[in-house]
Amino acid sequence: MAHSLRKTRKLRGHVSHGHGRIGKHRKHPGGRGNAGGQHHHRINRDKYHPGYFGKVGMRVFHLNKNHHYCPTVNVDRLWALVPEEQKTKVSAEKAPVIDCVKAGYFKVLGKGLLPKQPLIVKAKFFSHEAENKIKAAGGACILVA
């Protein structure tokens, strides 16, 4: 539908002319876009975008990480990982559970002898010999991620 009057004609006599009282149709008093981020808009940046400005340290690019980290424990040391109070409660039916990963060992190796007491061993890796010795004593090997 066509109008007989343009908006400017309609707004004649209204002081603010449709641009509000406060800003009074002034351009960009705070600057355009991200202007003043380190100056007059600093509080906003610090509150809502912490860490936006400033330097970032260097990555230690020459640090050689050991990707083959795998501490080992032998079969003859497994009983040393069982707490003393648990050793007294051990019976033929109830085997103690040894978590090698919690003790700081990833792999169980087969050196040494095991007593004829069954035990349940949790580790990331087992050598064949260690697995055979633990199973021969009536125990079990459980792989843990």
Swiss-Prot record:
Protein name, entry field: Large ribosomal subunit protein uL15
Gene Ontology MF: a single term: structural constituent of ribosome
Biased composition (Basic residues): 1-30
Cellular compartment(s): Cytoplasm, Cytosol; Cytoplasm; Rough endoplasmic reticulum
Family matches, as SUPFAM superfamilies: Ribosomal proteins L15p and L18e
Family: Belongs to the universal ribosomal protein uL15 family.
Record flagged with keyword DNA repair: no
Assembly notes: Component of the large ribosomal subunit.
